[in-house]
């Protein structure tokens, strides 16, 4: 029941067809999620791309995890909440550090009910339907940790964190959106697709997110690009020679 930020064409029929030809699949139970719109919402707003500038809060207006936690841990923590979503909070400095498309979506989200804006933390909380006192206390405590360079939840590189203090304040839903699948076709170092018996499937090559096993069960951020570029080049050369 999770949403996805992938393209409509990413439906996986290729994996089923390759399996029909005898290809082996690995890690098909492993998916990676990022904050995004929860089920029932369609506008994905990104206020979380800089962990030094945002916090996650639950429906009580409280932080519940370090925002730079490993992606699988973050996913499980958010989905364990009663509402199965959290909220991303930034101030105007954080908001303006994002690109124009991210800001545009947030502005649209204020109109559609997918994002909120307030001149104070209390105003923001009221717009969100959260406790004004709780959200104010959460932001104050976070800012105190930034000043002391010691985050209460152990957020790394505390000396690089930014206080959340410049109005207006912004928030959006942070549900879990499927972003990447670690599962896929089993391949070797030559980007050849392997059969269930372990040998190459003649003439079949694969690279990038179509493959599985390259990243284990928890991909590090941005490594998918390296995977696709390196093995895409190898696969292309192999296919040209086949």
Describe each region flagged by the PLM:
Residues 134-218:
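A glycine-rich dinucleotide-binding beta-alpha-beta segment and adjacent secondary-structure elements
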Residues 1-17, 172, 211-242:
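A conserved FAD-binding loop/helix module that cradles the flavin
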Residues 33-38, 72-75, 176-182, 210-225:
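Glycine-rich phosphate/pyrophosphate-binding beta-alpha loops
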């Amino acid at each position: 029941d999770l949403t996805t930020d992938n393209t409509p064409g990413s439906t996986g029929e290729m994996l089923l067809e390759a399996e029909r030809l005898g290809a082996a699949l690995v890690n098909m139970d492993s998916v990676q999620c990022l904050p995004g719109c929860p089920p029932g919402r369609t506008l994905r707003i990104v206020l979380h791309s800089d962990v030094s500038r945002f916090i996650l809060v639950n429906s009580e207006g409280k932080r519940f995890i370090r925002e730079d936690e490993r992606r699988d841990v973050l996913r499980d923590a958010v989905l364990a909440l009663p509402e199965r979503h959290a909220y991303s909070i930034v101030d105007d400095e954080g908001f303006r550090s994002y690109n124009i498309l991210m800001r545009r979506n947030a502005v649209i989200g204020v109109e559609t009910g997918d994002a909120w804006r307030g001149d104070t933390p209390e105003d923001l909380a009221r717009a969100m339907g959260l406790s004004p006192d709780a959200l104010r206390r959460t932001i104050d405590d976070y800012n105190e940790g930034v000043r002391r360079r010691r985050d209460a939840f152990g957020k790394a590189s505390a000396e690089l964190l930014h206080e959340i203090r410049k109005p207006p304040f912004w928030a959006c839903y942070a549900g879990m959106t499927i972003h990447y699948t670690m599962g896929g076709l089993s391949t070797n170092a030559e980007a050849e697709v392997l059969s269930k018996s372990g040998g190459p499937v003649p003439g079949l090559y694969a690279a990038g997110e179509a493959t599985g096993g390259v990243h284990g069960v928890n991909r590090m951020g941005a490594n998918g690009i390296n995977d696709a570029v390196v093995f895409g080049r190898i696969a292309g050369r192999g296919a040209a020679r086949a």
